[in-house]
């Protein structure tokens, strides 16, 4: 404990790290305050029905991603999901369309162009979602809740919603560039964490008020299960398969280099949280197309987060996207070529093509159980709801919520660890190494 306190003190001794932490916290505070700023022209005292709607089904997830802004009719109500959806589409185009494939190979300049295309597509999605959100507001709120009416007000409110999401994107970029961690990921995480106390209090209140008794025991069981799910999720995020690599001995001057065995850590879940986000973004399309108010037909079936068909399709998409995103982020051919250039080889495997094939086969084998476990984590909240756990609390039993929390926390701690070790301070872990996960 004493060493941990000393490490915390060391964090604030490093001026650059201290400034980055303060800058990040200030921008996250701006985001949280903005989540409570209601759209101009709406009476904030009449949002009860909207908040009730935003606590059920897929809308509860959308509300959580926006930090409660969706249910507050806030200027940030559309959150970052349009940006995430646009990122998904652009990444898919980077595989299928030659122009975007070329941009991916152009390094930093290509990345900037890809980001620009992502922003353009985000605006297109916002132009579609803004009116849909306003239509939902008119359906859920009484006419007296609106101080202004008519087409011109809806246009004005849509522009404000678009501006709100663009401002969130700007905050995320500033945090990534000048703060600590991935900005968009931290913004999503803050929205999730902000809902956790309410979810726990709500579940505790429901259990303690049970007249039949046993509520306290059930609450304890739920918290214990949540703890073990959290630990299992950390194991999934951190799990690696170490591939031994031998480097040839080289003598430069009077010093000998190489000749020692090292390891390539291949992640069991190289795709991180992206497969679940991809799958959820697609599963939300029917809900978005129905104006956030799917009550019957195919849209209702595919929006029922506890339904059989929803979870079957959701789980299959998570597995498919895990393979897809792993193939995008892990390139065995490049790994084999880099290894060969540096005089490295896997014992018993020929350098070059054979090494690439070996790495590809290993990735395929470890991705299979990783994808199935990721799918189980994704649908765990649905099972929790079926067992009578409240919608808000059940969302923390797995899925995007838990993976984002674990992943973002580990990534941020890894950055802090790097700053400490670079300046010869003890890290946060005894080993001095804290593994993160793939960026979001």
Give names to the regions the model predicted.
Residues 1-104, 109-440:
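N-terminal cationic and glycine-rich segments that engage phosphates or anionic surfaces
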């Amino acid at each position: 404990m004493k060493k941990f306190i000393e490490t915390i003190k060391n964090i604030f001794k490093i001026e650059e790290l201290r400034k980055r932490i303060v800058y990040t916290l200030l921008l996250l505070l701006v985001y949280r305050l903005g989540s409570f700023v209601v759209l101009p022209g709406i009476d904030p005292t009449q949002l009860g029905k909207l908040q009730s709607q935003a606590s059920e089904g897929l809308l509860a997830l959308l509300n959580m991603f926006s930090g409660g802004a969706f249910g507050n009719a806030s200027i940030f109500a559309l959150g970052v999901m349009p940006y995430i959806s646009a990122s998904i589409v652009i990444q898919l185009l980077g595989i299928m369309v030659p122009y975007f494939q070329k941009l991916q190979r152009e390094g930093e300049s290509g990345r900037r162009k890809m980001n620009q295309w992502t922003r353009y597509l985000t605006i297109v999605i916002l132009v579609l979602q803004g009116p849909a959100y306003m239509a939902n507001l008119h359906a859920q709120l009484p006419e007296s809740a609106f101080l202004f009416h008519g087409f011109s007000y809806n246009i004005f409110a849509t522009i404000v919603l678009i501006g709100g999401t663009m401002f969130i994107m700007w905050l995320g970029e500033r945090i990534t560039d000048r703060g600590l961690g991935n900005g968009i990921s931290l913004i999503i995480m803050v929205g999730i964490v902000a809902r956790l106390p309410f979810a726990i209090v709500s579940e505790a209140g429901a259990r303690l008020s049970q007249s039949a008794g046993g509520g306290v025991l059930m609450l304890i069981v739920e918290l214990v299960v949540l703890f073990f799910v959290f630990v299992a999720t950390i194991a999934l995020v951190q799990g690696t398969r170490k591939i031994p690599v031998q480097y040839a001995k080289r003598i430069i001057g009077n010093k000998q280099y190489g000749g020692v065995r090292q390891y390539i850590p291949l992640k069991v879940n190289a795709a991180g949280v992206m497969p679940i986000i991809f799958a959820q973004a697609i599963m939300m399309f029917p809900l978005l197309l129905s104006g956030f108010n799917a009550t019957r037909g195919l849209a209702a079936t595919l929006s029922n987060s506890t339904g059989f068909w929803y979870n079957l399709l959701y789980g299959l998409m998570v597995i498919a996207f895990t393979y897809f995103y792993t193939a995008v982020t892990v390139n065995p051919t490049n790994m084999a070529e880099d290894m060969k250039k540096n005089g490295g080889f896997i014992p018993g495997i020929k350098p070059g093509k054979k090494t690439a094939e070996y790495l590809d086969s290993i990735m395929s084998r470890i991705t299979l159980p990783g994808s199935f476990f990721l799918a189980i984590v994704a649908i765990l909240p649905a099972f929790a709801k079926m067992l009578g756990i409240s919608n808000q609390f059940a969302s923390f039993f797995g899925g995007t919520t838990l993976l984002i929390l674990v992943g973002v926390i580990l990534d941020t701690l890894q950055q802090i660890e790097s700053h400490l070790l670079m300046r010869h301070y003890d890290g946060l872990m005894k080993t001095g190494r804290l593994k993160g996960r793939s960026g979001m």
